[in-house]
């Protein structure tokens, strides 16, 4: 079984004080590079897709490609639903073989968030799928969701304790000052808050918006309980910058088998760096 739940890999990371990287995928090349590099480094791996990614590529196609790559590289991996909000959509995707779910009800009032998350937990656990939920809101842009900085709310540690207990989630995404997309100013993470959250809950913690963070901040967050680190924008920038540079040098190029090579090489360097920072190399 090559498409697995992320629950056990995150619990192992929690016990051994490293983090599992979750790379957002957008096309075939992204999936190829991420799986190949993780396999070479014997790193646990989560492939994450937003609703927009699954809509763009087709859920069945994503599942089939992920399964084929995992088998080719002998790398069991978690295929993850990132920032999903609709129960019916989640149900279809879990039934299609996906075993890792992030239900995002962070835009809703607390009681509504709890109710939605509980319903997703009840569904997902019937299929042995793990569930991540977010408490608090990150600023920035993720897929079609835009959260202004003034609307971003940090996670309350005591509320996190209640949230985890009432929902039965397997991991908790925390808001401590990160943001989706590119940072317009130097991020200042609330590590004191993160430590307090860790002391209030026993599930692995998740850090969204890691692209652009200093390596030292990521390592410190891992030391304070973060077991899953999400990376999206950094991969997209590496991919697109390499493509742009190739076409500037080769304006007549038209063969994707050629111009995708430098783009894949650029992404590979990002994946290697993230795995190194997460401390998960050789943890399979």
Swiss-Prot record:
Cofactor note: Binds 1 zinc ion per subunit.
Active-site annotation: 82
Assembly and interaction partners: Forms a complex with GatZ.
GO annotation terms (biological process): D-tagatose 6-phosphate catabolic process; galactitol catabolic process
Task of the protein: Catalytic subunit of the tagatose-1,6-bisphosphate aldolase GatYZ, which catalyzes the reversible aldol condensation of dihydroxyacetone phosphate (DHAP or glycerone-phosphate) with glyceraldehyde 3-phosphate (G3P) to produce tagatose 1,6-bisphosphate (TBP). Requires GatZ subunit for full activity and stability. Is involved in the catabolism of galactitol.
GO annotations of cellular component type: cytosol
UniProtKB keywords: Galactitol metabolism, Lyase, Metal-binding, Zinc
Family matches, as NCBIfam families: cbbA, PRK09195.1, PRK12737.1, tag_bisphos_ald
Pathway(s) served: Carbohydrate metabolism; D-tagatose 6-phosphate degradation; D-glyceraldehyde 3-phosphate and glycerone phosphate from D-tagatose 6-phosphate: step 2/2
Family assignment from sequence similarity: Belongs to the class II fructose-bisphosphate aldolase family. TagBP aldolase GatY subfamily.
PROSITE patterns: ALDOLASE_CLASS_II_2
Name of the protein described by the UniProt record: D-tagatose-1,6-bisphosphate aldolase subunit GatY
Broad EC category: lyase
Cofactor: Zn(2+)
Gene source species: Klebsiella pneumoniae subsp. pneumoniae (strain ATCC 700721 / MGH 78578)
A GO molecular-function annotation: zinc ion binding
Reactions mediated catalytically: D-tagatofuranose 1,6-bisphosphate = D-glyceraldehyde 3-phosphate + dihydroxyacetone phosphate
UniProt-annotated binding residues for dihydroxyacetone phosphate: 181, 209-211, 230-233
E.C. number(s) listed in UniProt: 4.1.2.40
């Amino acid at each position: 079984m090559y498409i697995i739940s992320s629950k056990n890999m995150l619990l192992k990371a929690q016990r051994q004080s490293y983090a599992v990287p979750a790379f957002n995928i957008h096309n075939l090349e992204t999936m190829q590079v991420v799986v190949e590099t993780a396999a070479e480094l014997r790193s646990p791996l989560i492939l994450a897709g937003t609703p927009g990614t699954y809509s763009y590529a087709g859920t069945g196609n994503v599942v089939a490609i992920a399964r084929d790559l995992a088998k080719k590289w002998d790398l069991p991996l978690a295929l993850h639903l990132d920032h999903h909000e609709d129960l019916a959509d989640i149900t279809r995707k879990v039934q299609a073989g996906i075993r890792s779910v992030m239900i995002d009800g962070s835009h809703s009032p607390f009681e509504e968030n709890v109710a939605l998350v509980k319903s997703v937990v009840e569904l997902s656990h019937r299929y042995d799928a793990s569930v991540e939920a977010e408490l608090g809101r990150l600023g920035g842009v993720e897929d079609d969701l835009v959260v202004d900085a003034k609307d971003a709310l940090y996670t309350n540690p005591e509320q996190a304790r209640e949230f985890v207990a009432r929902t039965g989630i397997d991991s908790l995404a925390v808001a401590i000052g990160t943001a989706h997309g590119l940072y317009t100013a130097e991020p200042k993470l609330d590590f004191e808050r993160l430590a307090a959250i860790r002391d209030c809950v026993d599930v692995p913690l998740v850090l969204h918006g890691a692209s652009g963070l200093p390596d030292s901040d990521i390592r410190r967050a891992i030391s304070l309980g973060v077991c899953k680190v999400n990376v999206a924008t950094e991969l997209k920038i590496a991919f697109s910058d390499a493509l742009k540079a190739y076409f500037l040098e080769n304006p007549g190029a038209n063969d994707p088998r050629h111009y995708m090579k430098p783009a894949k090489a650029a992404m590979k360097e990002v994946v290697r760096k993230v795995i190194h920072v997460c401390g998960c190399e050789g943890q399979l």
